[in-house]
Amino acid sequence: MNQMNPAFVMPDVQSTVDTRQIPIQRVGVKAVRHPLTVCTESGDVQPSVGVWNLDVRLPADQKGTHMSRFVALLEENRAPLTVERFRAMLASMLEKLEAQAGRIEVTFPYFVNKTAPVSGVQSLLDYEVTLAGESRDGHTRVFLKVLVPVTSLCPCSKKISQYGAHNQRSHVTIDAELAGDLPVEALIRIAEEEASCELWGLLKRPDEKFVTERAYENPKFVEDLVRDVAQRLDADERVIAYVLEAENFESIHNHSAYALIERDKRLAA
């Protein structure tokens, strides 16, 4: 069996000087699958699996970063994920990598237990959530992104038809820069409450009747959808800025209807 000579010191190639003198804005690891737990709005802990991207800025005179330290950071942070813990994790990464700037992003499925509107049966519905943070020159920003599936029904179709109206599944994506802790469920509720109707994982016939009639009584263009959600985000002090998108997967076309609103409240102050 090979044994290392105690007098031998392994060279640290990454820390050597690079003579090309070209800085690298972002270098790190991408698409690392790692388990995590998330604190829910009710205080429970939900297990999930995250896909992580972690990177730092590399100075012009440094040959390379220490890739193993990114994965070590994930191993050391097993506590349930919150916005504050995520901020602390970002600061820890910069310290470990001796970097002045860096970014962490994790995307994971998040489940909400929902109760059907009439029958009361319960089922889970999944949402795609991304938590991202970036730190540069001592300033840290944290973003919470949620993709919320909903139902939309066309006002024009309802107006011109003797009966019925075309409707479809839609995606509302809210990417919010946070001023403080904001539960995932809060953004989900905003999107669902402003749609023609929300979705459930399991519905009985009385529930289907409710969903059909609810959407018919609450028709919205894609423009209506983004504007109504934007009003809610504008009124929420926990949101500093946002990029809001809505995509309707049109049931009568082979294309989607799309709208986007972007706002930074700091610029309006």
UniProtKB/Swiss-Prot annotation:
Entry keywords, A to Z: Hydrolase
Keyword Hydrolase part of the UniProt annotation: yes
Gene3D superfamilies associated with the record: Urate Oxidase (3.10.270.10)
Superkingdom, natural source: Bacteria
Pathway the protein contributes to: Cofactor biosynthesis; 7,8-dihydroneopterin triphosphate biosynthesis; 7,8-dihydroneopterin triphosphate from GTP: step 1/1
Reactions listed under catalytic activity: GTP + H2O = 7,8-dihydroneopterin 3'-triphosphate + formate + H(+)
EC nos: 3.5.4.16
HAMAP family, sorted: GTP_cyclohydrol_B
UniProt-recorded name of the protein: GTP cyclohydrolase FolE2
Lineage, opening ranks: Bacteria, Pseudomonadati, Pseudomonadota, Betaproteobacteria, Burkholderiales
